[in-house]
Amino acid sequence: MSIGGVQDKQKEIAFFDAHAVSDEYDVFTPEASARLISAFVRLSGLSRGARVADLGCGSGVFTDLLQRAGYSSIGLDISPMLVALGRGKHPGVELIEGDAENLPFANESFDGVLLSGLVHHFPDPRRLAAEVRRVLKTGGRFVAFDPNRMNPFMWLYRDRASPFYSPVGVTENERPILASRVAAVFRNEGFRVQTDYLAGLAYRYVASPATRTLLPIYNFIDATLFELAIMRPFRPFVLTSGEKLT
């Protein structure tokens, strides 16, 4: 992930609207989704009742799980079709259409922010980080999860520098991230930042037919090899979290 350039928002909308129509958006198993929310609870340290924004909420799976965990959650996504899909699936959850770089929320209106696989969709995430800072209260926390460029599978399949890169199922905007670069962006926005890594998030679906046949092998390796402590920096997902200092 390089710092520079702007997100092509129309391509993001078109891509995810198409996924909403095909109902192929929610790629994680229910157990993997629950594990991500457990990571949010652990890293954010927020109490039940805290107001949390789920940015890049897609069809609202994580927004719903945040609500079930006791938070007052609202989800935002740039895709109107995914928001509509989510409202149908989760009628008791508030989901709205919007741009994470121009959030329709007041200053200091949230205790926490979840960036749902969102940061790696921005060639330059500095404006996104500034908006997260703006809407968080002082002492508020954010947690982001994104594919790790240091993971060999993520690099081979999702990085444009790889000879095996597949454009199927990914947008033109997204790149796997380097943890240090994302941490630096949020640190420069006035956050106290920490980095962790997560394995064991089983996929139920990937868009590429060729890769889909190998999915059980990937899920097995992810749940075994990458759980070893020595493999921590190479786990498939980076967890970036931070506290707004002032």
Regions found by a protein language model. Name each.
Residues 59-102:
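Class I SAM-dependent methyltransferase SAM/SAH-binding core
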Residues 164-181:
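Acceptor-substrate binding/catalytic loop of class I
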Residues 157-162, 184, 194-246:
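A C-terminal cap/extension of S-adenosyl-L-methionine-dependent methyltransferases
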Residues 101-112:
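A short acidic, Gly/Pro-enriched loop at the edge of an enzyme's catalytic core
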Residues 1-47, 49-56, 61, 143-165, 207:
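Conserved class I S-adenosyl-L-methionine
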Residues 126-138:
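A short glycine-rich, Lys/Arg-flanked "PGG" loop and its adjoining helix->strand segment in the class I
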